Amino acid sequence: MGKTKIRSIDLFAGCGGLMDGFEQSGAFDTIAAVEWEKVPCKNLENRLREKWQYQDAEERVLRFDIQRTEELFKGWENDQEYGSSVGLDQLIENARGIDVVIGGPPCQAYSIAGRVRDEFGMKNDYRNYLFESYIKVLELFKPTAFIFENVPGILSAKPGDRPIIDIIQESFDETG
């Protein structure tokens, strides 16, 4: 009898690089991968199906705006941009829970290169706060563990009067 795999979801999945690392271990079962860009989602579906042998890859990849968390959880129908999906609640219920959340929000607002290129140093960039959607996923699904990755520039990014890393750390601490 085989070992039970660790059930994971990947947020801000991009083309699936982080997910691939977890899948390569052989210990993880990717329940869902959330990404809002069309081309990376097609790549994710292909990787899950062809490389990792998930026959239901299209259902596991949720192409949606993670900031619309209520719909992301409950599902959506006939959205002009994103079509229809059952949402994370149903996928996670079908998997009988979730063990790990992996992912990291887009790095442009945190990276030193991104801040140098922007005349306001990315202080007004909404991506500074996409971690809040990650927190909502943690609060609702209560995984045993999470992996939140990003660029080294996150340690010095300061969109307001406080370093963003302090705000993120406090949010994680409050979540438990």
Name each region found by the language model.
Residues 1-176:
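Conserved active-site and SAM-binding loop architecture
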